[in-house]
Amino acid sequence: MIHIFSSKGQVHLDGHKELSKNEPVVEFMPEKVLIPAVDNKGVALANLVEVGATVQKGSLLGVRQDFQIPVYSPVTGTVAAVVKVMSPVVGRPVNFLQITVEKEQGEEVKLAPLASDDKESVVAKLKEGGIVGLGGAGFPTYIKYNTKDPIDTILINAVECEPYLTTDYVEGIERISDVFLALPALLKASGAQRVVIATKADKVHLIEAIEKGIA
């Protein structure tokens, strides 16, 4: 049997979480950003915004062709160029949109609020929001809920095993109320009977935030 920490070739890395776990999330506004113009397999986005176009934070940049998932701009600015950049996800150079960021970001383009918490409405809103997994595959969240198979449990993974990373931990503390705000609609749409929020036992402050949210 292979053991994750003691088998040959396995290494237990130090977490180094102390470097950032007590730091607040701050907004960093660079002079330019690079947004992939392809999906996680390297296929070009459909309906891609043209070079020279002005975009707003939250405006549509393009659509993934495989699952028809929209990709939105994280900033307000101008599409300056399409450049080839090495993609750690695709594993080769691919096209990226280079957006010059405006100093004044203005209002964000926001989606209309969820009108109903029935399954069809929630699935449609998850798709419209472009919500996907962050593990590299970019698998659309709406597909997980758009199933005929019974769903017993919604699992929210805040374990964050990777060294140095504390995004889930800090965001969980600062924005746990957003999680609980969304859960009723997700529970109704999925038909799940329970929710499990997974984290590590030593993440005391996150556990306290979760327990406070439950109370």
Residue ranges, per PLM feature:
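Well-ordered secondary-structure scaffolds
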Residues: 1-215
